[in-house]
């Protein structure tokens, strides 16, 4: 061990010479890790165990930033426990289910006591001592009951803390800042704003009433033991999005990330120019390595999911010596990020009743197209010299519908692949299992959309009961079709002849001839709004779900008019819809009490799968 490292370690040990806890650094040094990286690993895992820090170091062995002197960022929060926490967690769950995710869902229920600040890795234990001393100083004057006053505005909902209890909490935050400055050389800015516990922030205005009703179920008088909790985060990724891997992924190329289920990945939305459609560039939280990853293997995680809880101080005058040990060992034994456990969700029967008791609109993207897999020349690959169709690969459909102008018209109106048909059937089967009641079906005139609707209805056992209403107004933005000479949809008669149960009597909001190649973005969102108005007026007024099968763009342009939201910016719109996978869904429910629609969880889970590349057995034989 270098002399400088020995001196640094001695300084840390001497500063806390009175502590009885054994050093966590010695085992790491004995394993051969340098002092600075060992201290970095201890700080990143909450200084819980040497084993956790060693695991972190092994995981980050190829981390290019391992030797960089980048400290963690820390913050102190006042967190509720007990019955009050259970009620707050129930609000977190229900508000997200009924009103979609808002900024408050990114973090657990808390009162912020100070801004985030940095602390050198070798001084983190001094920070723990500062927390203990500040807590002991205020323990006798900390309020036995913290009154919470509900406050609501058009973009904020939360509890305010007023009067003398707020003064006592501020005094504690100031004491912590003072102790940390002396012991750990940290500059901490205690919170100067009115103390508050946020319930919802930056939500859609039409959700305000629902959120207020949910908040009224939280009784501030619920029993609660307040705990001061010290958390840390990686300061480099504050403005990144956090993704969570749903499945294992083994890299196919050297520049791809290895993923294990549960891994977190940091993604900078502004630095994705190099990534192709369906991929992202990210940095693994587990390894620190950078690379490409398939987006459909991940889901959005909460900001605080990667935060690490270090130590807590519980305010309780009756605390004995055993319970005070909570301060010494209050975070997870494995050093993993802290995620508050949620109370059990409502029963499946209650969820089903809630689903079928409202009128709903389910917007679904079509399944996988043949040209998505085999490229623009797919038609040449499956056409004989005399213009007949044959199946060169199992992912080509068994047959194609007859068209009056021949097979060439499929070039601009491709069918579903075999996998696309399977996707549609899988979604239909899941809808059947969920118990929802589909009462009407609309589809874009594109063959892939009508096919998807047909296969979903077949799995729902409704293919003979419900007719597909073809609505040209929900076809995708014509700007994306500008390279195609003309749109060549199958006529209703051709669809009928091909055994599609289409409604020949339905009068669409817009005729096919209204789809013009020079369409602007404003014209596109306007025709979608007009079409949705017609669909809503045409749908049965009784309870049930109207199924709309269209394109990825429809998940945005067909739902925002329902929700009363203005059109998205054109650039944001294009970036958003390119990431929507096959059979992606958005679900809107009508709230008849206020005559508005809410965006809620779809009745079925998402569909995710990997690629299956082309294989030639001749090449395999010759390689031997």
Swiss-Prot record:
Every UBA domain range: 19-60
GO-annotated cellular components: cytosol; nuclear speck
Gene Ontology terms describing biological process: negative regulation of T cell receptor signaling pathway; regulation of cytokine production
Pfam families registered for this protein in UniProt: His_Phos_1, SH3_9, UBA_7
Domain of life: Eukaryota
Domain SH3, chain residue ranges per copy: 238-303
Record InterPro entries: His_Pase_superF_clade-1, His_PPase_superfam, Phosphatase_SH3-domain, SH3-like_dom_sf, SH3_domain, UBA, UBA-like_sf, UBASH3A_SH3
Compartment(s): Cytoplasm; Nucleus
Alphabetical list of PROSITE patterns matching this protein: SH3, UBA
Keywords, alphabetical: Cytoplasm, Nucleus, SH3 domain
SMART domains the UniProt entry points to: SH3
Region spans: Phosphatase-like: 358-624
Subunit and interaction comment: Homodimer or homooligomer. Interacts with CBL. Part of a complex containing CBL and activated EGFR. Interacts with ubiquitin and with mono-ubiquitinated proteins. Interacts with dynamin.
More details: Has very nearly lost all enzyme activity. Has very low, but measurable tyrosine phosphatase activity at pH 5.0.
Entry function: Interferes with CBL-mediated down-regulation and degradation of receptor-type tyrosine kinases. Promotes accumulation of activated target receptors, such as T-cell receptors, EGFR and PDGFRB, on the cell surface. May inhibit dynamin-dependent endocytic pathways by functionally sequestering dynamin via its SH3 domain. Exhibits negligible protein tyrosine phosphatase activity at neutral pH. May act as a dominant-negative regulator of UBASH3B-dependent dephosphorylation.
Protein name: Ubiquitin-associated and SH3 domain-containing protein A
Annotated source species: Mus musculus (Mouse)
């Amino acid at each position: 061990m270098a002399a400088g490292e020995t001196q640094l370690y001695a300084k840390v040990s001497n500063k806390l010479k009175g502590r009885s806890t054994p050093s966590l650094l010695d085992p790491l040094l004995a394993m051969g890790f340098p002092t600075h990286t060992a201290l970095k690993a201890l700080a990143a895992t909450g200084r819980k165990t040497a084993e956790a820090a060693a695991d972190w170091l092994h995981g980050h062995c190829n981390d290019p930033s391992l030797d960089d002197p980048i400290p963690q960022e820390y913050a102190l929060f006042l967190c509720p426990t007990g019955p009050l926490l259970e009620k707050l967690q129930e609000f977190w769950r229900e508000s997200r289910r009924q009103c979609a995710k808002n900024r408050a869902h990114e973090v657990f229920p808390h009162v912020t006591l100070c801004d985030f600040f940095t602390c050198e890795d070798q001084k983190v234990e001094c920070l723990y001592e500062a927390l203990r001393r500040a807590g002991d100083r205020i323990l006798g004057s900390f309020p036995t009951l913290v009154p919470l006053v509900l406050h609501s505005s058009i973009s904020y909902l939360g509890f305010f803390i007023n009067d003398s209890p707020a003064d006592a909490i501020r005094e504690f935050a100031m004491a912590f800042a003072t102790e940390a400055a002396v012991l750990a050389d940290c500059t901490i800015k205690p919170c100067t704003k009115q103390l508050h516990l946020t319930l919802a922030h930056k939500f859609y205005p039409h959700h305000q009433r629902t959120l207020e009703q949910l908040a009224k179920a939280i009784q501030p008088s619920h029993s609660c033991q307040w705990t001061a909790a010290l958390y840390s985060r990686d300061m480099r990724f504050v403005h990144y999005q956090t993704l969570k891997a749903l499945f294992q992924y083994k890299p196919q190329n050297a520049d791809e990330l290895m993923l294990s289920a549960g891994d977190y990945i940091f993604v900078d939305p502004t630095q994705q120019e190099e990534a192709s459609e369906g991929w992202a560039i990210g940095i693994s939280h587990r390894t620190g390595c950078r690379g490409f990853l398939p987006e459909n293997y991940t889901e959005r995680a909460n900001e605080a999911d990667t935060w690490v809880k270090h130590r807590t101080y519980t305010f309780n005058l009756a605390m004995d010596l055993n319970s005070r040990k909570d301060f010494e060992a209050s975070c997870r034994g494995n050093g993993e990020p802290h995620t508050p456990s949620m109370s059990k969700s409502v029963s499946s029967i209650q969820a089903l009743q809630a689903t079928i008791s409202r009128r709903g609109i389910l917007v679904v993207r079509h399944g996988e197209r043949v040209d998505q897999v085999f490229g623009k020349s797919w038609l040449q690959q499956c056409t004989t010299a005399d213009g007949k169709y044959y199946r060169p690969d199992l992912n080509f459909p068994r047959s194609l519908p007859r068209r009056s102008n021949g097979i060439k018209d499929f070039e601009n109106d491709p069918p579903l692949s075999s996998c696309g048909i399977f996707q549609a059937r899988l979604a239909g089967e899941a809808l059947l299992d969920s118990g929802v009641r589909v009462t009407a079906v609309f589809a874009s005139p594109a063959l892939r959309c009508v096919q998807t609707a047909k296969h979903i209805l077949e799995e729902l056992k409704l293919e003979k009961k419900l007719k597909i209403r073809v609505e040209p107004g929900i076809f995708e933005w014509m700007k994306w079709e500008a390279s195609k000479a003309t749109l060549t949809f199958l006529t209703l008669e051709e669809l009928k002849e091909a055994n599609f149960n289409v409604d020949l009597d339905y009068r669409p909001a817009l005729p096919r001839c209204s789809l013009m190649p020079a369409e602007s973005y404003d014209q596109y969102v306007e025709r979608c709004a007009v079409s949705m108005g017609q669909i809503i007026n045409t749908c049965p007024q009784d309870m049930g779900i109207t199924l709309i099968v269209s394109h990825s763009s429809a998940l945005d342009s067909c739902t925002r008019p329902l929700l009363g939201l203005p059109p998205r910016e054109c650039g944001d719109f294009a970036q958003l819809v390119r990431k929507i996978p096959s059979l992606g869904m958005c679900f809107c429910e009508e709230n008849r009490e206020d005559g508005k629609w809410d965006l809620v969880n779809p009745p079925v889970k998402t569909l995710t799968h990997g690629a299956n590349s082309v294989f030639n057995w001749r090449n395999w034989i010759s390689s031997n």
